[in-house]
């Protein structure tokens, strides 16, 4: 994705994708005057709820940029999210920016402080990764966590560095694109975490005890079923389905046919599932969408997010093509529940990840988590 789950936000504003190139467009609107009632009666199928942490240590209110504080905070936020009843704590990954860059040590630290909550990435940029080393790190971390990782991978997003991949030792051969390279790295990573043979054994070494190809160690059973591809378009989602990934979409699509964002994204999910089934993969293939939503409970919330009550779709140009982003949902718990219930893509997805303003600290984010949990209760999605 472009990166579909990867849009920078400031602490006191909700996500809007590339506002310098996006303009208001038709779509879902939020009037802020919906009746105070649950949107859906309890008893619906469970839908998983998580946060997506952007890991900034810039624009932190009342504090100097501090990487250690951001790292300490995200571990504490995972604990707070588990206490609030959330199902997942997910991280963004960026390089050459004041944001999280090395996810596996963070995920391991989160695992050590929690017991139940899933721990994910949205997404790891495969332009910067050796897929076999990443498979070792992923399996090790998954075993430490007790099998709780949900790893999103993809091509990555627009970034600060002009030659970042080259500085990591990765360059394109003639005729290659990063889309091609990252797809191949993703497939090799999947093969490795599935436990397939990778390296030829050296039977003269005294260490190889079989003539069969050697797999990456350690091996974590089940991890391969918890790998997600970040898709910012329908063709990318279809390819993810063919390759056997779960599919992670977000608040941005690198396409726009004029229909509301949530309708286009629901179609993306449907096309992914068709491709997954047609390829003969076991299971239905899971899907996740990212949203921005804030339950306004007091004056502080109103100051930060009150203006988002009127948020709606935006459309414009990004990376030379049409793009469309979804709205922020803000209001009372009942109002946010009603807006989510009317979102076709949210209805279709197995997971919903909400971007959280990590710069506002652990205590404030714990309040945000409690608001989301109340919305889930109203919708009956925590059954």
Residue ranges with predicted function:
Residues 49-53, 89-91, 119-121, 149-153, ...:
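Hydrophobic faces of well-ordered beta-strands that scaffold small-molecule active sites
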Residues 33-117:
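N-terminal beta1-alpha1-beta2 module of alpha/beta enzyme domains
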Residues 39-45, 172-216, 249-250, 257-349:
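An alpha-helical appendage that flanks or caps ligand/catalytic pockets
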Residues 5, 9-18, 23, 30:
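Low-acidity, Ser/Thr- and Arg-rich intrinsically disordered low-complexity segments
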Residues 45-67, 128-198, 255:
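Flexible, glycine-rich active-site loops centered on histidine and acidic residues
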Residues 235-237, 241-254:
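A conserved active-site cap/scaffold subdomain adjacent to cofactor or substrate pockets
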Residues 43, 82-83, 107-115, 138, ...:
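Acidic (Asp/Glu)-rich catalytic clusters
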Residues 57-71, 124-131, 223-231, 324-334:
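Active-site mouth loops of central-metabolism enzymes
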């Amino acid at each position: 994705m472009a990166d579909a789950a990867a849009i920078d936000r400031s602490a006191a504003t909700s996500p809007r994708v590339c506002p310098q190139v996006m303009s208001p467009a038709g779509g879902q609107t939020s009037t802020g005057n919906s009746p105070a009632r649950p949107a859906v009666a309890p008893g619906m199928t469970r839908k998983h709820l998580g946060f997506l942490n952007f890991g900034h240590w810039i624009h932190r209110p009342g504090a100097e940029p501090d990487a250690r504080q951001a790292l300490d905070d995200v571990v504490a936020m995972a604990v707070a999210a588990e206490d609030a009843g959330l199902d997942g704590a997910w991280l963004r990954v960026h390089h050459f920016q004041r944001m999280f860059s090395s996810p596996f040590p963070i995920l391991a630290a989160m695992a050590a402080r929690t017991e139940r909550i899933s721990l994910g990435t949205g997404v790891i940029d495969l332009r910067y990764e050796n897929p076999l080393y990443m498979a070792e790190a992923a399996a090790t971390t998954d075993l430490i966590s007790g099998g709780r990782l949900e790893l999103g991978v993809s091509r990555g997003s627009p970034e600060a560095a002009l030659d970042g991949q080259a500085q990591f030792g990765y360059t394109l051969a003639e005729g290659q694109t990063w889309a091609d390279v990252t797809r191949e790295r993703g497939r090799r990573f999947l093969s490795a975490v599935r436990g397939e043979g990778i390296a030829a054994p050296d039977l003269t070494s005294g260490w190889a005890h079989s003539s069969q190809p050697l797999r990456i160690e350690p091996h974590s059973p089940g991890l391969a079923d918890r790998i997600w591809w970040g898709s910012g378009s329908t063709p990318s989602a279809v390819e993810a389905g063919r390759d056997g990934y779960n599919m992670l979409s977000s608040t941005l699509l690198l396409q726009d046919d004029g229909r509301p964002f949530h309708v286009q994204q629901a179609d993306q999910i449907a096309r992914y599932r068709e491709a997954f089934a047609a390829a003969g993969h076991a299971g239905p293939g899971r899907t996740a969408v990212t949203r921005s939503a804030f339950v306004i409970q007091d004056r502080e919330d109103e100051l930060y997010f009150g203006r988002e009550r009127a948020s709606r779709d935006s459309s414009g140009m990004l990376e030379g093509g049409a793009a469309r982003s979804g709205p922020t949902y803000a209001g009372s718990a009942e109002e946010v529940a009603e807006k989510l219930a009317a979102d076709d893509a949210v209805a279709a997805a197995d997971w919903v990840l909400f971007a959280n303003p990590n710069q506002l600290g652990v205590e404030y984010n714990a309040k945000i988590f409690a608001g989301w949990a109340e919305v889930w209760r109203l919708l009956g999605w925590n059954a």
